[in-house]
Regions:
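Non-catalytic terminal accessory segments
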Residues: 1-135, 382-400
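Soluble catalytic domains of enzymes that build or remodel membrane lipids, polysaccharides, and related
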Residues: 138-139, 143-400
Length: 400
């Protein structure tokens, strides 16, 4: 959408919320305060959008960008709650035509109007706290049929959708790296949408990823946001940091007499940006040993159909953020076959991470961020139920 239509639509949505809520608050000072907050949120929106394209250079610009992004999260809750209120009042009015006096519409309108700012503020503050804290560790056992004994207990740590950019900087990334390094991983998988910005602006903030530790190294695949941010430059930068970037490629890891193929595809939408980089699970697997366990890193869950057809055993994805906050955790299901967790797709397992950071507004509500520790176990052994825990100390693993 072009800037002017986007601004016009945004203005109409803000005006709708202001009209429906402010007019129902029942006190002039409440209405004035609500309109002032709404106006501040609207006026700082351009700074939020600008920060997604280029790093703010001045402290005031950074403050305005933060204000715009927090305000965007607040407004999303205000809009949803206002629509729900109007639907509820409409239903109450219909009931009142059948049962006159059965519904106290005036009281309902007043109380619901006053509840909207309070609920939206609560959700936004709690969502901010959830987004800004370091992701908890989610532990998942993946049952694999005919798993070679040498791969029993193989540990994969997945991080995804960090979105280093306007509000996620080096300290946030350093905390993630420290948490991952305590998990004694065999392999670290970074499943795309690492950045929202150029190498020039963000290289210093991504640099801590070079300190990730595991036995077999760190592997990265592109997400759609890498293509918005200069994918070729980021692939070069990550390789410079010692991170293996898989572009429809694979490597073979050995454990005794067992092998595991670690393959990665470009983002599902990469072909729209560069036809030569179209996502291709079959090509990623070409030339791999046929008897090996096959693991695919694919940013979007909808790669699953092609991945299963190519013969993969397990796909690790992200992209969805689990919806990040209401109501998107319901709407994301319209675009992706899986939104979060371990799911079976025909003969293949798919694990979809809710993401380790966040995108846009610093807000997570109903979809907590995660660092995922996946453990391969034989299918005949009961898998442990997924659990959430803060990172725990573990023996140091040797470097990448």
């Amino acid at each position: 959408m072009r800037p002017m239509p986007l601004r016009a639509v945004s203005f109409l949505l803000y005006a709708y919320v202001g009209w429906r809520v402010a007019s129902g608050l029942g006190a002039v000072w409440m209405s004035a305060a609500f309109v002032a907050v709404l106006a501040l949120s609207f006026l700082t929106l351009p700074f939020a959008f600008r920060a997604r394209r280029a790093e703010p250079a001045r402290p005031l610009e950074r403050l305005l960008a933060w204000s715009g992004l927090v305000g965007m999260g607040l407004f999303s809750s205000l809009l949803v709650l206002t629509v729900v209120r109007d639907l509820a009042l409409g239903a109450a009015a219909l009931i009142a035509t059948v049962v006159p006096g059965g519904v106290p519409i005036a009281t309902l309108a007043l109380l619901s109007a006053r509840a909207i700012p309070l609920v939206a503020a609560f959700v936004t503050v709690l969502g901010f706290v959830n987004a800004r804290r370091t992701a908890a560790v989610v532990r998942v056992d993946v049952p694999v049929a005919d798993l070679p004994p040498a791969l029993d207990g193989f540990r994969i740590v997945q991080i995804s959708d960090i979105h280093v950019g306007p509000t996620i900087k080096r300290p946030y990334v350093e905390a993630i790296v420290a948490a991952v390094n305590r998990l004694d991983a065999d392999l670290v998988a970074v499943t795309g949408d690492l950045v929202d910005g150029s190498v020039r602006d963000l290289a210093e903030h991504v640099a801590p990823l070079a300190e990730l530790r595991s036995r077999d190294g760190t592997f990265f695949v592109t997400g759609n946001h890498e293509y918005y941010s200069g994918a070729a430059a980021w692939v070069s930068e990550l390789r410079r940091l010692g991170i293996t970037t898989l572009m429809n490629q694979h490597v073979v890891l050995r454990r005794g007499d067992a092998a595991i193929v670690v393959a990665g595809v470009t983002d599902f939408s990469a072909g729209h940006f560069d036809r030569d980089q179209a996502s291709d699970p079959q090509r990623a697997l070409a030339g791999s040993p046929p008897a090996a366990l096959r693991l695919l890193l694919a940013h979007q869950p909808r790669s699953a159909e092609a991945a299963e057809a190519a013969g993969f055993d397990l796909q690790l994805s992200g992209h969805t953020h689990g919806g990040q906050f209401l109501p998107w955790n319901f709407l994301v299901r319209l675009q992706q076959p899986f939104t979060a967790g371990l799911k079976r797709w025909r003969r293949m397992w798919v694990y979809t991470s809710r993401g380790t950071g966040y995108w846009g507004p610093p807000k997570r509500f109903g979809a907590p961020s995660e660092i995922t520790l996946l453990r391969l176990v034989p299918a005949h052994r009961p898998a442990a139920a997924p659990s959430r825990a803060t990172p725990r100390p573990a023996p140091a693993a040797r470097g990448v």
